[in-house]
Amino acid sequence: MSSEGMSSGGPAAADRALMDVALERASASLAEGGIPVGAALAEDGRLVAAGHNERVQRGDPIAHGEIACLRNAGRQPSYRAMTLYTTLSPCQLCSGAVLLFQIPRVVVGEARSFAGDLDFLTSRGVEVVLLDDERCVALMREFQQRFPQVWSEDIGGR
């Protein structure tokens, strides 16, 4: 697992721009009273789809940000050249989707609020880049303070 956000050059410009898209989706979810996890899917730096967690808004326990993003991408001939950007480390469900669709690279905004399954992904050959983006951390902290009950009934209670 690499921490591009901590290397001398920082993350690539395309990674920053696509994480910005995921962060916009996460902010939209928080504005709706939902869990602020956003995701973007890209191929060769081109945005394919974006989505955000809608578990609270839709009352759907599997409407995670990464799953919503994949749903919004629709049918694709292949995901093998794509990168998934997510503001928060993916859970087991979303990590499973990454493996199912053979997405080779995942860029994670932050893993402080929730560690997720990053080691599981890397053990399966997925390149994981952890940006440790302070904006993603701040958004999750705001959510945890405003909606502690929702956080505890979701991944915060695990």
What function would you assign to each model-found segment?
Residues 1-29, 96-158:
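Zinc-dependent deaminase
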Residues 22, 26-29, 39, 65, ...:
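Small-residue (primarily alanine) positions within well-ordered alpha-helices
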Residues 35, 78-80, 102:
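Short loop/turn motifs at secondary-structure junctions
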Residues 37-45:
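Short beta-strand scaffold segments in enzyme catalytic cores
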Residues 54-68:
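A short, polar/charged loop-to-alpha-helix boundary motif
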Residues 69, 91-94, 98:
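Short cysteine clusters
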Residues 77-89:
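Immediate flanking context of iron-sulfur cluster ligation sites
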